[in-house]
């Protein structure tokens, strides 16, 4: 995210194999997601079918989202995977969230949405970011919701052995435009800065009293 721009004279800049998703539930299958009326609709386009399936999955996911009354609800996300090897793609719910935000951005037909893709119009992000999977061995420690520093455990015991914890982190790119401020801000009159922001995810950790448990910890999730 881009820090709120302010006049240069008024503001000083300060630095700052097997797999599973914890908490993920699915229901039904691709044949039942469409409902009883699918048989009478005929053959639909692949894009419309894909949109329908995603919306069904998003509706299901809303059941396990924190209450909107919780002021920290928007800080929760599912960017943790338990796997025997490095994941090859971003987490499923991350992709669904991105797609949902894209659909909510404009109230238009699917065809218009496809042609209004930012990539087609040559649009650029205000701040450049990079995303990658990192292991608990790379993170070592993290800060939990109470502000305490906890140790992130590298492996999680499962019935048939152990799986490693992987975290999908997004941060501001160390190359390119990030060092020069937010893209699109007139540097002659405004100061701006791209900075990495964090969210809470659930991970297996150990506190300073050697107590092991699932806790919400902060990881880098956006720029």
Swiss-Prot record:
A GO MF term: growth factor activity
Gene (name only): BDNF
Residues that carry a glycan: 107
UniProt-recorded name of the protein: Neurotrophic factor BDNF precursor form
Acetylation among keywords: no
GO cellular component terms attached to this protein's record: axon; dendrite; extracellular space; synaptic vesicle
Location(s) in or outside the cell: Secreted
Chief subcellular location: secreted
Propeptide residue range(s): 6-114
């Amino acid at each position: 995210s881009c820090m709120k721009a302010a006049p240069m004279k008024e503001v000083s800049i300060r630095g700052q194999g097997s797999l599973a998703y914890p908490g993920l539930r699915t229901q039904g299958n691709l044949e039942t997601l469409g409902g009883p009326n699918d048989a009478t609709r005929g053959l639909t386009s692949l894009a419309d079918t894909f949109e329908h399936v995603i919306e069904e999955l998003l509706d299901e996911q809303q059941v396990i989202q924190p209450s909107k009354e919780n002021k920290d609800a928007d800080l929760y996300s599912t960017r943790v995977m338990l796997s025997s090897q490095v994941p090859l793609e971003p987490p499923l719910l991350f992709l669904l969230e991105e797609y949902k935000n894209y659909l909510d951005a404009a109230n238009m037909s699917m065809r218009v949405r496809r042609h209004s893709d930012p990539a087609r119009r040559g649009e650029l992000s205000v701040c450049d970011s990079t995303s990658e999977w990192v292991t608990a061995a790379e993170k070592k420690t993290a800060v939990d919701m109470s502000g305490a520093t906890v140790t992130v455990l590298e492996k999680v015991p499962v019935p048939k052995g152990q799986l490693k914890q992987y975290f999908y982190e997004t941060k501001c790119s160390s190359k390119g435009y990030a060092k020069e401020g937010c893209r699109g801000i007139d540097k002659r009159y405004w100061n701006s800065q791209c900075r990495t922001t964090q969210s809470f995810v659930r991970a297996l950790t150990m506190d300073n009293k050697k107590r092991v448990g699932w806790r919400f910890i902060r990881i880098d999730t956006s720029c």
